[in-house]
Amino acid sequence: QLGPQVPAHLRTDLSKKQGPWAEEEAAYGWMDF
């Protein structure tokens, strides 16, 4: 859903979080870089 913009290592982090907020967090998190 987030698309290819999200780095693979961030996607792996999402799997570890396993929370309903994980997707949104990643969407904003990768922009922090």
UniProtKB/Swiss-Prot annotation:
The modification Phenylalanine amide is found at residue 33. InterPro entries: GAST, Gastrin/cholecystokinin_CS. It is found in: Secreted. GO terms for biological process: G protein-coupled receptor signaling pathway; response to food. One of its GO terms (molecular function) is hormone activity. One of its GO terms (cellular component) is extracellular space. Keywords: Amidation, Cleavage on pair of basic residues, Hormone, Pyrrolidone carboxylic acid, Secreted. Transmembrane segments: none annotated. The modification Pyrrolidone carboxylic acid is found at residue 1. Its main location: secreted. Gastrin stimulates the stomach mucosa to produce and secrete hydrochloric acid and the pancreas to secrete its digestive enzymes. It also stimulates smooth muscle contraction and increases blood circulation and water secretion in the stomach and intestine. PANTHER family: GASTRIN. Belongs to the gastrin/cholecystokinin family. This is Gastrin. The gene is GAST.
